[in-house]
Amino acid sequence: MITLEVDLGERSYPIHIGTGLLDNAELLRPHVRGQHAVIVTNETVGPLYAARVEAALAALGKTVRTVTLPDGEAFKHWETLNRIFDALLQAGADRKTTLVALGGGVVGDMTGFAAACYMRGVPFIQMPTTLLAQVDSSVGGKTGINHPLGKNMIGAFHQPNAVIADIDTLRTLPARELAAGMAEVIKHGAIADAEYFGWIERNIKPLNACDPDLMALAVQRSCEIKAGVVAQDEREGGLRAILNFGHTFGHAIEAGMGYGAWLHGEAVGCGMVMAADLSHRLGFIDTETRARIRELTQAANLPVVAPELGADRYIELMKVDKKAEAGSIKFILLKQLGEAFITTVPDADLRATLAHAVLKPPTEAPVA
């Protein structure tokens, strides 16, 4: 087992990465201080893993209740969130009740938001079961739900007590979900570590096959990068914004296509290709770097051709973004591979990227 630390002073917490962790009651013991625990999971993950976590908590003498939500980004809204609140209130949960997020990014975001709001804040633990959640969304304390007009526009910063990432859970991931997680792995290399990016390029085939040793290394390095950024800028006042590389375009794709049509990681992957193109148009990265980002994204089985929403629609959607100020869209671009920054861009260059993004090269099969 590997243990990292997210250094936030009194609110610091560990990230445990390894195998067989779902059954490890001793990992949970320091972080479940009250008598009651509520596991929040979904219809896909619950039947696979909930009983194991329930048993670990019961071994600590805790009273355990499990809430099962519908699965998917399309259910990341108020109505589903209220199901968590209903369960907490019906169970008589108090301020020492610990919530346990057992699932992917949607479960983690919603459980964290429920923990932030219930009685103005209760503790929670992240137990991510998807690659995307293990390398990205479970770390850093961002929680929230979607609104029909924008992704993650309603939420709060609420740090978990611990992140417990059991690599074994990745074995049950569908190939599409694994690819979605690889988008965030690639992102971390692109924005912060060119050497790591090269390592991903060299190992993309076994990573796609979910090689356990390589996957553990990828989760570790991605968590190191994200934890380092969060420790410097917890609430996205500056540096942390670089973690949104590909997300401004990606969120527009998700909203424009309807939440759930594209997985979050698929949209981010395509968004990174678009952001790399924009970085190149503005003279920051060379043609080779732009091509490497596109080729690695495609090699990870992610879409590299954007849906044809129309430039005006893309721009409208991107203005509903947490980084936007006074209607001005801000993008995370690359100065070079491994170094990102936030900036506004000329409208003509943005529209050129949007026009280029929907073009399918003659030799490329259409992307679904």
Curated annotation (Swiss-Prot):
Residues engaged in binding NAD(+): 71-76, 105-109, 129-130, 142, 151, 169-172
GO BP annotation list: amino acid biosynthetic process; aromatic amino acid family biosynthetic process; chorismate biosynthetic process
Binding site for Zn(2+): E184, H247, H264
Pathway(s) served: Metabolic intermediate biosynthesis; chorismate biosynthesis; chorismate from D-erythrose 4-phosphate and phosphoenolpyruvate: step 2/7
Keyword list, A-Z: Amino-acid biosynthesis, Aromatic amino acid biosynthesis, Cobalt, Cytoplasm, Lyase, Metal-binding, NAD, Nucleotide-binding, Zinc
CDD domains: DHQS
Cofactor: Co(2+); Zn(2+); NAD(+)
Domain of life (superkingdom): Bacteria
PANTHER family, per the entry: 3-DEHYDROQUINATE SYNTHASE, 3-DEHYDROQUINATE SYNTHASE, CHLOROPLASTIC
Task of the protein: Catalyzes the conversion of 3-deoxy-D-arabino-heptulosonate 7-phosphate (DAHP) to dehydroquinate (DHQ).
Similarity annotation: Belongs to the sugar phosphate cyclases superfamily. Dehydroquinate synthase family.
Protein name, per record: 3-dehydroquinate synthase
Biological source species: Cupriavidus necator (strain ATCC 17699 / DSM 428 / KCTC 22496 / NCIMB 10442 / H16 / Stanier 337)
Gene that specifies this protein: aroB
